[in-house]
Amino acid sequence: MLKVLIPTIMLFPTIWLTSPKWLWTTTTAHSLLIASISLMWFKWTSETGWTSSNTYLATDPLSTPLLVLTCWLLPLMILASQNHINPEPISRQRLYITLLASLQTFLIMAFGATEIIMFYIMFEATLIPTLIIITRWGNQTERLNAGTYFLFYTLAGSLPLLVALLLLQQSTGTLSMLVLQYSQPLQLNSWGHMIWWAACLIAFLVKMPLYGVHLWLPKAHVEAPVAGSMVLAAVLLKLGGYGMMRMMVMLDPLSKELAYPFIILALWGIIMTGSICLRQTDLKSLIAYSSVSHMGLVAGGILIQTPWGFSGAIILMIAHGLVSSALFCLANTAYERTHSRTMILARGLQIIFPLTAVWWFIANLANLALPPLPNLMGELMIITTLFNWSPWTILLTGLGTLITAGYSLYMFLMSQRGPTPNHITGLQPFHTREHLLMTLHLIPVILLVTKPELMWGWCY
């Protein structure tokens, strides 16, 4: 664990002491090294339990894929941000990269924590850098409103969780995940216990976000700079799913009945947010709502609490993290050239950027779950689980997948096909940096098809 954590912490002096000329090169190289070292976690010494462990930090089959995704994303965020942060003063550039690196440190400690209180503290600590990135480097003044929404939604959900955790500590005497899995299941039957159950899960459902408490997400995504959108879509939403899976172990007797309304809400949300996507004119807003739709499926898979549901949820979280991050990068490259996120003003780009149209095509097909890709594997596992629970859910999930295909193709056709407007014919060509960025996003998605056990979690 420390093999990754110590180099990540050493990024901070590197960022502040490197000469301005080499700042971006050094940080990108350093973070790529960290990402390659993190791949070692995939080599589990024991197939089932915790590995790389000390008293407070450990990895297991559930957290490993998410940890590697976190480390993989930092060099990509630094690569994506170069163009629009470069004109700023050097101290601000350093601060920006410092915030990204601190976010990675918090996330590694959140996914690696074995103590639930430590997970909670890191879960909350990720708010601070994200909030600064959104409110300081966002595009329009609306970013302050988005930051407020983001902060208050997440904090309002998290405070009951803290109280619930303290109550759990009082009743079981420990909050270590290593011990809790062997402790006696709690006898939960009163109203107070039901409120306690809700308090444990609401924080994660807000973070995912579940339809109904998702209003902060489109605002935050649309206003954030590209690195903010990438880390929000790829890793921060996954904190919610990860936390739910960890808490479900302790909430076992109650969860069977109380989860029903949340499952229905998640499935209804897939259709509702998908329908909202079909009406969007703003490119980033469309990708943000599609994230809500996918995470609704993940929430359903986790709340069912079967091995297939958990596996499907992890697979879909990893695949969605890479793909939606890639889509935000593509949206940003178009925005940097046309200075507009409105799809009608920047259409027909395929004629000008043919290779980029290929990236758009692959990313969109991955988003709508094309057969060999892991997105489909995750969706099929979750849909099968839900169908086993109640055959009626096939109506909702089937309609949801249909709408997903619809808005993905709509996004591709609106941005790439059609006549090219006269005002965007003189755009600068794509850089190698951007092609590298897309390669590093989409190659892992394609490679995961060949060895999907890496993200099957406990089932494997």
From Swiss-Prot:
Provide the protein name. Answer: NADH-ubiquinone oxidoreductase chain 4
Location (main, coarse): mitochondrion
Q: How does it sit in the membrane?
A: Multi-pass membrane protein
Which controlled-vocabulary keywords does the entry list? Electron transport, Membrane, Mitochondrion, NAD, Respiratory chain, Translocase, Transmembrane, Transmembrane helix, Transport, Ubiquinone
- Keyword Ligase among UniProt keywords: no
Q: Which PANTHER family match?
A: NADH-UBIQUINONE OXIDOREDUCTASE CHAIN 4
Reactions that this protein is recorded to catalyse: a ubiquinone + NADH + 5 H(+)(in) = a ubiquinol + NAD(+) + 4 H(+)(out)
| Subcellular location(s) of the protein | Mitochondrion membrane
Provide the function of this protein.
Core subunit of the mitochondrial membrane respiratory chain NADH dehydrogenase (Complex I) that is believed to belong to the minimal assembly required for catalysis. Complex I functions in the transfer of electrons from NADH to the respiratory chain. The immediate electron acceptor for the enzyme is believed to be ubiquinone.
Q: Which family does it belong to?
A: Belongs to the complex I subunit 4 family.
Q: Which GO terms describe its molecular function?
A: NADH dehydrogenase (ubiquinone) activity; ubiquinone binding
Q: Which InterPro entries match?
A: NADH4_N, NADH_Q_OxRdtase_chainM/4, NADH_UbQ_OxRdtase, ND/Mrp_TM
Keyword hit for Mitochondrion: yes
Q: Which gene encodes it?
A: MT-ND4
